[in-house]
Amino acid sequence: MDIKQALARVAERLDLNTAEMQGVMRQIMTGQCSDAQIGAFLMGMRMKSESIDEIVGAALVMRELAAPVTIGVERLVDTCGTGGDGMNIFNVSTAAAFVVAAAGGRVAKHGNRAVSGKSGSADLLEAAGVYLELSPEQVARCVESVGVGFMFAPAHHGAMKHAIGPRRELGLRTLFNMLGPMTNPAGVKRQVLGVFSQALCRPLAEVMARLGSVHVLVVHAQDGLDEISLAAPTHIAELRNGEISEYLVQPEDFGIKSQSLIGLDIEGPQESLALIRDALGRRKTEHGQKAAEMIVLNAGAALYAADQAGSLKEGVALAHDALHTGLARDKLEELASITAVFRQENQA
């Protein structure tokens, strides 16, 4: 199916099957479609709502065209969300990655600069002195030595350049917002995937099952966050060994008091970094303590997804202990140090 046929189908609010979607996505990602065609297709898909088959087909093509990262480590996990929740709080899932590493987990973190928010994972890490332009081999060395490696999405998804213009001009969430967390270049099969709408939780868990994932927690909080929230119950669709279950969790389930998100919002990556360093360090401020509890909830979910813990409650307890050792803050500094060496190698 070509793009013109797909547009005619979508205009009638009819779904494409997986193979048809793969054909259209290959055209888009190989520069065979005009900006007008891409924009019209993305808007049409959003208006009718993307089907599971369509999301699977699109993700398969993005994975096929990505520059892969091979990491010789068992039970790799990712903490990557769709973004677009409009809340502008600090980089919770990125901070959680360092707690996971401090607890003995291994994180292959996939991310980008902010699109609609104030600080994307790449913005935060760059502010912390982490060099982003790494080769696949260098990313693998980060994971193996530090416990965290960062894959800067533009470096691994070069074919995305064909959709950047239409996406920017639309200025709306589109299919591509959902695809980022599903197209980790290291091929992780375990992750915490935050989404901008509760209606996406179960469908995306089904998508991840079809893409071969083993253990995934798709999360959306009732206050709108694409994270496990400190301020409201969070809906989770959990994929584990081919089965999907859905449930609600709240901080009190883990011995943590629910609190407002006041003080956790940020204006940019430097502010996010300062809050995270306080949370991972001595927690000298009230906001730093609150941020630490939010990080622990999400790191605990990642440890559970990685099967480093037997339950979500056990994962949160493990994350709590890891954060309070101070090792997580050390991991952030270690990642900055090792990537500084790689920067010198690359520029030599």
UniProtKB/Swiss-Prot annotation:
Cofactor binding remark:
Binds 2 magnesium ions per monomer.
Pfam families on file: Glycos_trans_3N (PF02885), Glycos_transf_3 (PF00591)
Pathway membership of this protein?
A: Amino-acid biosynthesis; L-tryptophan biosynthesis; L-tryptophan from chorismate: step 2/5
Quick one: which residues bind anthranilate 2?
R167
Role, per record:
Catalyzes the transfer of the phosphoribosyl group of 5-phosphorylribose-1-pyrophosphate (PRPP) to anthranilate to yield N-(5'-phosphoribosyl)-anthranilate (PRA).
Family, similarity comment: Belongs to the anthranilate phosphoribosyltransferase family.
- Protein name (Swiss-Prot/TrEMBL): Anthranilate phosphoribosyltransferase
Taxonomy of the source species? Bacteria, Pseudomonadati, Pseudomonadota, Gammaproteobacteria, Pseudomonadales
